[in-house]
A protein has these predicted regions:
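N-terminal membrane topogenic signal
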Residues: 8-36, 59-62, 84-87
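Juxtamembrane "helix-exit" motif on the non-cytosolic side of transmembrane helices
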Residues: 40-51, 77-81, 104-114
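Structural signature of hydrophobic alpha-helical transmembrane segments
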Residues: 54-69, 123-133
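Cytoplasmic-side transmembrane-helix entry/capping segments in multi-pass membrane proteins
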Residues: 86-97, 148-156
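Alpha-helical transmembrane segments in multi-pass membrane proteins
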Residues: 108-135, 152-170
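Membrane-helix interface linkers and caps
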Residues: 114-116, 133-158, 182-193
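Membrane-embedded catalytic scaffold of the fatty acid hydroxylase/desaturase
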Residues: 153-353
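Cytosolic-facing loops and C-terminal tails of multi-pass membrane proteins
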Residues: 335, 345-387
Length: 387
């Protein structure tokens, strides 16, 4: 099924006049509306608890947005199906109708028992819409590689990573934050915490950038230099086309390790919640920006903050660029520890060297364990019949 999706929807040119653009808009928007309708039906299990007060306060606005999205997706689907005779436009129209039935209040959802766990469907939908509205036009007007398609090779796999990381946000938080919180409660009080918390929020924000980037620099470097860790990080480097969606291609083991290492100094030093929130929003957007297909170079900032030019070289498969530019935000760490590579021209080829990594989301998940799975089969597998 995954191979069929990639064959049908990857490396496609959205040419005007063939109904492809309207069909793509219809299918994408109707799927998001379907997720949104499910969030209205089952808010206790499909929405993020921190955002529920916002939904309650502006329920009319969100409901209007859902209905508007359904109408727009149905309109594009009908145009593509009827005028251009594109079957995917018909599929988008059908999905829009299903979303309308679920979202209009005709179906009464059963009352679900209160559970401590949730799936962040709302977080996935809202984040995808915002990022797509920002980065698709940005990459269209300022593309580093103008020939790269929006539906380029690998985007189906990357959207699955994006979806998994956003819907499973509670799982990631539980597996990283909870152990740290438990451990810190058993430590003696840190005398630095009151001093940190007494500082203004803007200063704490800057300190967060410096401290967290220092810890993640060494983890990132270890992922390149330690073979066991590299097998997980290689998944991120397997993309051969850089854009905003490529930043999502991260193995779950790498996500857990990075979030744990990044979260540890935040709790140990006791940064204020407002500073942490500002940091998370900023660094999340920045991480997507430095992967995006844009030609911005920022010559006066290139050693102060990581730019797309800087990080694209980290992903380059050119020999001089391999195992360089580890910093996520502060390039000076690479300068100090002699791991920087910034020539005067832009990177042009990407991917891993010497590794054949599968394209499938599921196969990429199991790829780092392939060697150990084979060893297990050799030791415990059924012996072959000598006859």
């Amino acid at each position: 099924m995954t191979d069929q999706l990639r064959a049908k929807f990857e490396n496609i040119e959205l040419n005007a006049g063939l109904g492809k653009i309207s069909a793509f808009i219809s299918m994408t928007l109707s799927l998001l509306c379907l997720f949104g309708a499910l969030c209205f039906l089952f808010p206790s299990v499909l929405t993020t608890p921190e955002l529920r007060p916002l939904y309650s306060k502006h329920s009319d606005l969100f409901y209007f947005s859902l209905m508007a999205g359904i109408i727009i997706s149905a309109g594009f689907g009908a145009f593509s199906a009827i005028v251009r005779q594109n079957r995917y436009g018909f599929y988008g129209l059908c999905l829009a109708l299903i979303a309308a039935v679920l979202g209009c209040g005709v179906i009464q959802a059963p009352v679900l028992p209160s559970v401590p766990f949730y799936a962040g469907f709302d977080y996935f939908v809202l984040t995808l819409i915002i990022l797509a509205l920002v980065f698709i036009p940005l990459e269209g007007f300022f593309a580093k590689n103008p020939k790269q398609k929006i539906l380029r090779v690998g985007w189906v796999t990357d959207i699955k990573y994006f979806m998994f990381s956003h819907i499973g946000i509670q799982l990631f938080s539980f597996l990283t934050v909870m152990p740290i919180q438990y451990w810190i409660t058993h430590l003696p009080s840190n005398p630095i915490v009151p001093w940190v918390q007494a500082q203004p929020i803007w200063l704490q924000f800057i300190e967060l950038l410096i401290v967290v980037d220092f810890t993640t620099y060494w983890l990132h470097r270890a992922m390149h230099e330690v073979n066991f860790l590299w097998r997980f990080h290689a998944i991120h480097h397997s993309t051969e086309h850089m854009d905003w969606l490529a930043s999502s291609r991260l193995h779950i083991v790498e996500v857990l390790m990075t979030r744990f290492i990044a979260t540890l100094p935040i709790f140990l030093l006791g940064f204020h919640t407002s500073a942490v929130f500002a940091y998370l929003v900023f660094i999340s957007f920045h991480a997507i920006f430095i992967h995006s297909n844009v030609r911005f170079r920022f010559p006066y900032l290139r050693w102060l903050i990581a730019t797309p030019e800087f990080h694209h070289w980290h992903h380059s498969s050119e020999k001089p660029a391999i195992d360089k530019n580890y910093a996520a935000f502060i390039p000076l760490y690479d300068v100090i520890f002699k791991s920087v590579y910034m020539p005067n021209h832009l990177a042009s080829v990407y991917g891993t060297v010497g590794y054949k990594i599968p394209n499938s989301f599921v196969k990429q998940f199991t790829w780092p364990f392939k060697k150990y799975i084979q060893r297990f089969k050799q030791h415990f597998g059924k012996p072959k019949d000598p006859l």
